[in-house]
């Protein structure tokens, strides 16, 4: 009996709000292109590479007719792109529902480590502004130390960073802001704080605290 080899494909998630919901802080045009163009492209890219990997595993691709390292690198890039964007969308909420300050355990950890939310916001923003080129700034929970850690990531083709216990993330690729803010990334970051979904960030933290 021949064993069936099948790799599960990724699904393009539904945006948790309308494309104009984050205005005036992030424009409808940006969300439309970012979500329907770039994010969908990562999902399609990952699935296309899974098709190729599946054929390779089955022996349908003769040796010398594929670049295994290229497939694996491409999968890392596209899977990270998909998963990080899924977190990014849910990490934001429409104007009026997002922004402000966190509460609960997240607020307690921030105050314990930074003394105040304002100081945390300053350090996170400075970290984001210091990122050279495109990438992400990530707040994640370190399971070993119990600390919140800030990390900047150039691009997303190195390791599966999306599998970290991510609490909060901001996209710093130009497609996330250039249509509205041009080369003023700092203005985009300042605007982004007004749509941060702290309820989602708290839920993500609770999930990791309860493991």
Curated annotation (Swiss-Prot):
Has UniProt tagged this entry with the keyword Membrane?
no
Cell location: Cytoplasm
Q: Name one Pfam family in it.
A: Sod_Fe_N
Q: What GO terms are given for molecular function?
A: metal ion binding; superoxide dismutase activity
The record describes how the cofactor is bound as: Binds 1 Fe cation per subunit.
Annotated positions binding Fe cation: 34, 85, 171, 175
Describe, as the record does, how this protein assembles with itself and its partners.
Homotetramer at high temperature; homodimer at room temperature.
Instruction: State what protein this is by name.
Output: Superoxide dismutase [Fe]
């Amino acid at each position: 009996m021949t064993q069936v080899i099948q790799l599960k494909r990724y699904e393009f998630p539904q945006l948790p709000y309308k494309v104009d919901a984050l205005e005036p802080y992030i424009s409808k045009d940006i969300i439309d292109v970012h979500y329907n163009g770039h994010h969908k492209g990562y999902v399609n890219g990952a699935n296309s590479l899974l098709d190729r990997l599946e054929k390779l595993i089955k022996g349908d691709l003769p040796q010398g007719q594929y670049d295994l390292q290229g497939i694996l690198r491409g999968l890392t890039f596209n899977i990270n792109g998909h998963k990080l964007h899924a977190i990014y969308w849910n990490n934001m909420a429409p104007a009026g529902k997002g922004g402000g300050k966190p509460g609960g355990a997240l607020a307690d950890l921030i105050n314990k480590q930074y003394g105040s939310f304002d100081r945390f916001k300053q350090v996170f923003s400075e970290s984001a502004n210091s990122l050279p080129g495109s990438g992400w700034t990530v707040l994640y929970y370190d399971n070993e130390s119990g600390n919140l850690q800030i990390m900047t990531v150039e691009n997303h083709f190195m390791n599966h960073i999306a599998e970290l216990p991510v609490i909060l993330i901001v996209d710093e690729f130009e497609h996330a802001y250039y249509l509205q803010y041009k080369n003023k990334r700092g203005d985009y970051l300042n605007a982004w704080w007004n749509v941060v979904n702290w309820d989602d960030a708290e839920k993500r933290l609770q999930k990791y605290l309860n493991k």
